[in-house]
Amino acid sequence: MPQQGSFSQAEYASKKKQTRRDKFLAEMEQVVPWPRLVARLAPLYPKGERGRPPFPLERMLRVHFLQQWYALADPAMEEALYDSQAMRGFAGIDLAVDAVPDETTILNFRHWLERHNLAKGLFDEVSALLEERGLLMRQGTIVDATIIAAPSSTKNKEKARDPEMHQTKKGNQWHFGMKAHIGVDVASGLVHTVVGTAANEADVTQTAALLHGEEEDVFGDAGYTGADKRPELADRDVSWNIAIKRSIIRDLPKALRDLAEPVERALAQVRAVVEHPFHIVKNRFHHQKLRYRGLKKNTAQLHTLFALANLVIVKKALLAQPGR
């Protein structure tokens, strides 16, 4: 993004040490397909024909992505743009000549994305790019889900917990929130499908929604037992590789158990690929608790987060490929 030059920017550019943030943002500058994403959003972006002209679309998209990478609320994002030269440089903001989007503008941009279902559009655009580059294959899918906690407190304006979130028990612990269900490409570990549900929705119920229809093999943990017998999947000509429950393995005769355990270990190694995008979203992007109310808003954010996670996963391959 073209940037204005200023003394502060020149001074920052001349510093000798490159921080981890500098390095990450420099990589994202190159791997995010900015012209392609802006073109996807532009037809619906307000033209500012009445009143104050809107901020440039690409600048607002960059600020929105900064929010996702650093888990910043709207007020914190506004403050970060004043505090961090690295973030301002990435967003193309020079304080000497440019206005900084305030928290309301940042909020309104996110609401605009949600209103037009554009987070899903951004996810689809990134997926299309990765498929064109030969990085996203379609021969096999791993299905999995993770719980993301929602605030359980009733100390809010509505004086109630989010009615679209629910409790579920995992092991001996109860969790309140939603589930992020993903379909992941076996060969690359890239996410090709994202579905959001309440936390009490059984994993197996979303299996059909997580398949793109071209896969030959499907892998899942024991939470997907019986997927092949569900009516919506009865006509799928795929090889089902679903983990056997540990209690069943444990109760097998020793001879059968000795045969089953190596197979289960091999399948577990294949399924382990699915943990990488979850790790990036929850640990690198720090998305461990829901920020918004309602499944629609939070699922929209998940589409953005997993699109960005995909770019992180293949950043080396994209950086090695000239042009975009």
Question: How would you label these PLM feature ranges?
Answer:
Residues L259-E261, R284, K316-R324:
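A short, flexible helix-boundary coil/loop motif
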Residues M1-P35, A39-A42, A320-G323:
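Charged, often Cys/His-bearing segments associated with DNA-binding zinc-finger transcription factors
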Residues P2-S8, L57, P75, E79-Y82, ...:
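Polybasic low-complexity intrinsically disordered regions
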Residues P2-E11, E216-D217, A222-K296, A300:
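Helix-centered, glycine/charged polyanion-binding patches within enzymatic domains
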Residues R59-A71:
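Alpha-helical support elements that line or immediately flank enzyme active sites
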Residues P46-R52, L95, Y292-K296:
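A short glycine/serine-rich beta->alpha loop
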Residues R40-E58:
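An N-terminal domain-cap segment
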